[in-house]
A protein has these predicted regions:
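N-terminal cap/lid segment of alpha/beta-hydrolase-fold proteins
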Residues: 1-15
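Gly/Ala-rich beta-loop-alpha elbow adjacent to hydrolase catalytic centers
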Residues: 99-107
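Short aromatic-enriched loop/helix-cap "lid" or pocket-rim segments at secondary-structure transitions
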Residues: 43-44, 68-71, 132-137
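Conserved HGGG/HGGXW glycine-rich cap/lid loop of the alpha/beta-hydrolase fold
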Residues: 14-68
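Active-site loop/oxyanion-hole signature of alpha/beta-hydrolase fold enzymes
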Residues: 57-98
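Conserved alpha/beta-hydrolase catalytic His-Asp/Glu region
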Residues: 132-138, 148-172
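Alpha-helical elements of Rossmann-like donor-binding domains used by nucleotide-donor carbohydrate transfer enzymes
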Residues: 45, 49, 77-85, 109
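Flexible "cap/lid" loop of the alpha/beta hydrolase fold
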Residues: 108, 112, 116-150
Length: 172
């Protein structure tokens, strides 16, 4: 494992740690954890397998790493550090980025800002993409059953859900 700190150019040093795993000659896969999540908690169980084919770069936002005493300031500050890191360490290009929850917002911003290049951006939802297979299938089936009719007709099949929806839409 290699650990690097990303710094904002021309500003005081504020740590944001990138934990790297795998061969530097492999394509880069950046992993962005969710809100208030420790990178090992989100990704520790998949890093070994991913590092066989990728240089895995797990992001630890400022204030969210065991050796970091700084505090998280803003998404924009972190985004600038991430972009600077990608430019400085990966020549401005990564193969893919995956983010769940808040991490998905970082992936979307990287794509929208066009300051670095990534071939694939994967935006996940920690509710389903980190669940076990059975749990994810059950939750997906439930969500389809609850939302399918609403998506196609604008109304919920369940009278209780429809009344609640209308009540919430009428509230100021």
């Amino acid at each position: 494992m290699r650990v690097s700190e990303a710094l904002m150019a021309g500003k005081e040093k504020k740590a944001m740690t990138i934990h790297e795993f795998g061969d530097k000659s492999n394509p880069v896969l950046m992993l962005f954890p969710g809100t208030m999540c420790y990178w090992k908690g989100n990704f520790g169980h998949v890093i070994d397998a991913l590092s066989q084919r990728f240089l895995v770069a797990a992001v630890a936002y400022t204030g969210f790493d065991e050796n970091d005493s700084e505090g998280y300031t803003s998404m924009t500050d972190e985004l600038e550090k991430i972009e600077a890191y990608i430019r400085d360490h990966y020549n401005g290009t990564i193969r893919a980025a995956y983010g769940c929850s808040l991490g998905g917002s970082f992936v979307a911003q990287l794509a929208a800002r066009h300051r670095v290049h990534m071939r694939y951006g994967i935006i996940g939802s920690s509710d389903l993409d980190q669940a076990g297979r059975l749990k994810a299938r059950l939750l997906s089936a439930l969500m389809v059953k609850v939302t399918y009719n609403f998506i196609h007709t604008g109304e919920y099949r369940s009278r209780l859900m429809q009344r609640r929806f209308l009540r919430q839409m009428a509230a100021p």
